[in-house]
Structures are given as structure tokens and as C-alpha cells.
Amino acid sequence: CANPETQSSQPVLLHDMRKCVSCHTCEQSCPQKAIHFQKGRFHHDAQRCNGCQSCVEMCLQDALQLRGEDMESEAILHEVMKDKDYYDMSHGGVTFSGGEPFVQVTSLCEILQEAKALGLHTAVETTGNYPLADLQRAEPFIDLFLYDFKHLDDAKLLQFTHGNGQLIKTNLAYLLHQDVHKVIVRMPIITGFNDEASLVY
């Protein structure tokens, strides 16, 4: 999913209300007071949460899980290389997705460079909504760009996704000038947003 407007870059606490018995143990164990129940419903304040996982560890019903984790480049590549035989057999490789991989451009470039040194095919799912300098930095290490282009109208794009349409077009033009064969442009068709015939055809 290359939709950074819908993704958090931090680990996320998930609550399964089917398992929860509203015992309030999680609320009582949270040192940041990031959890409370209101009218029997679980509420989590992500701004206050520091990810300590006290609530997860104390929940006797396993109704809480923390998803997402910080990983060093070496750990990511170690996971990727577990499937190296499969990549070799299938002519596959590694695809960086998100959110938006370019949000962490320094780490992305480091991992891409190491992946290329290990002989891996690299692909990136992207919205193109970041500085051209970041793209220029990473582009030499990317074999394929899966470029999501959500709307041609800059105002509508800004209104619904907070994206910079001019920047997205500039980055796409740069990539197409570098090597048109490295880019697959995709436009997800979303009812009421970009499904007008003039945009699709």
C-alpha cells in the first residue's frame, strides 16, 4: 500500500474488542495514561503512548497487540536474504512499500545499496511526493518504480491527500527521462475522486 496519508510511521496499538472483557488492566498498567475506557469502549491516545507495551504484556485476554517495529538496515536485509533462493528461482526481488518508503530516505538508500550489492532486484512503491533530491539519491539503486498517480488535478489531490501535484509530476518526469522502462505508472480508480472519464481515458 503506497498510501502514506493513511499510514503511521510509528508502531500502532491494535485492540481486538471481540477478546476484550473490559477489565481495565491495560488502563491501570499504562504509565503514560494513554488508555481509557469511555462508556465501555476502549480508547487509545497515540500521542501519549511511548510504545512500552505494558498494556500488551498485562492483557490476560490477548486483546492488545503492538504492530510495527523499528529495525536496523542489517536486520531488514537479514530477513530479505532468507528468501534469496526463491528470488533467484523466480527472478524476483525485494519491493519497498509503506506508507511511503522515501519518508525514511537515508535508511532506504542504505538498504537499497546493500541489496544491489547482494545482487537483488529492487522495486519501490511510491507516490512521488518528496523532494527531487531524495529521488535522485535513491534512483541509481532502484530497478523498478511502481508509481502511484492518484489525480491529475493538483487542487483535488491536495484537498484529499495533502499531496503536492506539481512535485509528483516533476519527479515522474525526471524518472521517465532517466529510463522509461524502469517506471510503471498506476492510477487507483476511486469512486467520486478520480473516476471521471476524462482522467481515465
Language-model segments: residues:
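Conserved active-site region of classical short-chain dehydrogenase/reductase
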Residues: 24, 53, 105, 109
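Cysteine-rich micro-motifs
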Residues: 18, 46-53
